[in-house]
Amino acid sequence: MMISRRKFLAFLATSLAASRSHGQGVASRNVPAQPRGKPSGIPFLARFTDITRTAGLRYPTIYGPTDHKDYIIETVGCGCAFLDYDNDGWVDVLVLSGSRVSGAPQGTSNRLYKNNRDGTFTDVTERAGLLRTGWASAVTVGDYNNDGFDDLFITSYGQNTLYRNNGDGTFSDVTKQAGLLDSQVRWGAGCSFVDYNLDGHLDLFVSNYLEFDFAHTRKPGEDSNCQWKSVPVNCGPRGLPFSRHSLYRNNGDGTFTEVSEQAGIARVAPGYGMTVVAADFDNDGWPDVYIACDSTPSLLFRNKHDGTFEEVALLCGAALSQDGMEQAGMGVGIGDVTLNGRLDIFKTHFADDTNILYLNDGQGNFEDHTIQSGLGVETRFVGWGAGIVDLDNDGNPDLFFVTGNVYPEVESKVPAYPFKTPRVIFRNLGGAKFEELLDAGPGISEVHASRGCAFGDFDNDGDVDVLIVNLNEPPSLLRNDLKGNNHWLKLKLVGSRSNRTAIGARVTCSYGKKRQAQEVIAQSSFYSCNDQRLHFGLGNAATANLDIRWPSGTKQSIANVKADQILTVREPTARSKPE
């Protein structure tokens, strides 16, 4: 009965979308916020302090001018990553950057900062060979050649770049020799390493946002897609040409082959694709791909186990809002909010709309649980980077997202829509119920025009810190000053038969009476990559039991693991429990 209802709603939504007239360039349902309930009064022990300046992350992310945005490319921004590029056990920081139409200021570049293990970082960008100026978008991290060092793939407007980690602190641009140099100018957006055919080699999925060139783009205010709140603004995405998404198969010899057509990716109706998340949503052991799409239905490519995919988002309930409307999908958080071993989806949207929480039924079908969960109380902001992460180690994953408008021109005429806005936390109360926290430290209440964010433990103290990209400012590094006695466990997985980074590995952690699933993924949030060590808050549980399903199909169980440690788990070289 549920699938029949979904098919009906999918047909209805498609019909409505075809006839719907749009009065602005970006999707927003213009819904009022739900009334706030009485606060729970439960203490929240995580407090976030911005330590960017003392940590040494000093370079701004340049992205268009500060007081106006004439082109959509100046508004979107870019991502960041926590990664351990030198394998010293301490995550380092990568922050992307863009440019300006008038030319980038001196020193503009993507920036790599090495973790000094004392709360500070050293800029090693030039030494690492990563100096690059352009309109960078997204980053994915993974060991595509299985040599033991994580590599980087960065999308941009123009050309994407594959950086091979040389294992000596430097990277080499191997885009051309890897077969990834594009003959066309594309606007590369979300991207993810994913072993879609489970051969032990990481492939690449890339979403392309839209077709764009400066010479043929309308100026602010020239048509209905170039206005917001009756203020002339940059045009799009509506009214601009779609672009197609791409899948590249790893040949196992350092090169890639585009297989978008034969895999069924190129034949899907295009949309304005943004963040890409590769994860196993239907629990069949094969990675699927979800794309948050801006002002068009989001996409879910279900892996058919034969090298092809089927796009099923409408049928599975993960394309539109509950009332069948397109939303401006930006960022995506993936996690098990209900502690039932299934991966749920949290997706951020534009102002005057709710963000959305899709609950997974275990077979890859989703129910919009936004209003029931309490998320409908917040509609003021444009949401971007997001995560389902346990911020207070109580064993219940919380929701975090960053915000920032795209139209700086609007604030002076409509003050209710400022360009710079705060970060937002929804604390998990259990039972898929959340409450917004209005005070979680100065790092949360500070206002910025933020875009990407990444979650990780840069100081290895057992909690989750946050790295945030801010337009035309240095990034924000928010240290989690967590108090209390809640326990935690952090897992670094190393593949042997599977890809070395263990992307796609699923861990189910049982602690006390709770059971939570997480998966190693290579992109989420907004255009960003988290610390790929899986972090479990354990509450008052002093031990945990682990069940690991490696991408190779190997299953591994580890019982009575002591809490409060960072544990490295290597994949058994022989399949322990054949499927």
Residue ranges and their predicted role:
Residues 99-102, 211-213, 296, 352, ...:
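Short glycine/acidic-enriched loop and turn motifs that connect beta-strands
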Residues 93-97, 151-156, 204-208, 289-292, ...:
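Hydrophobic beta-strand segments that make up the repeating blades of beta-propeller
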Residues 110, 160-162, 245, 297-300, ...:
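Structural signal for beta-propeller blades
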